[in-house]
Amino acid sequence: IGMDDALEPYAIVIAPVLYMVKGDYDEKIRSYTRNGGIFVTTFFSGIVQENDLVTLGGYPGKLRDIMGIWVEEIDALPNGEENEFTYEGEKYPAKLLCDIIHTEGAKPLSEYEKDFYAGSPAVTVNSFGKGKAYYIGTASSEAFYQKLLTEICEDAGVAPVLKTPEMVE
């Protein structure tokens, strides 16, 4: 989906690492979500505006009200180091970057297990108008993304056209 394309035809819009939010793209996301869309983004989103200048007022910048969170700090993990979080009773790795999240209306779905930000949300969902906005504050495993995105798709009534066996893409 391009920045100029309509979001409304899609039940779910996933925009991982939406580092740059150009112009009024936040308004497009805001309207889409308010009117019942499901928006998913991740760590390192809303960091800069269209001229690559840092967004003032905290992250995820112009998406802050939609996501219902603000990011106080980003912990960059050295290569080979991991934190972890528990989601629905299963532990998953938190890798690369870990956003230290404070909720502003969003509901935490999981929390970090280690380091000085243990207990801080790792994944959140915010009800926004008729829609929902999910924020994934870290890089994780394929198993985690599979679990979360399957649940989001089921919630939105989105199903695959074909059922494929495991290990087939």
Question: How should these model regions be labeled?
Answer:
Residues I1-A6:
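A short, well-structured beta->alpha microelement
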Residues A11:
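Conserved acidic residues
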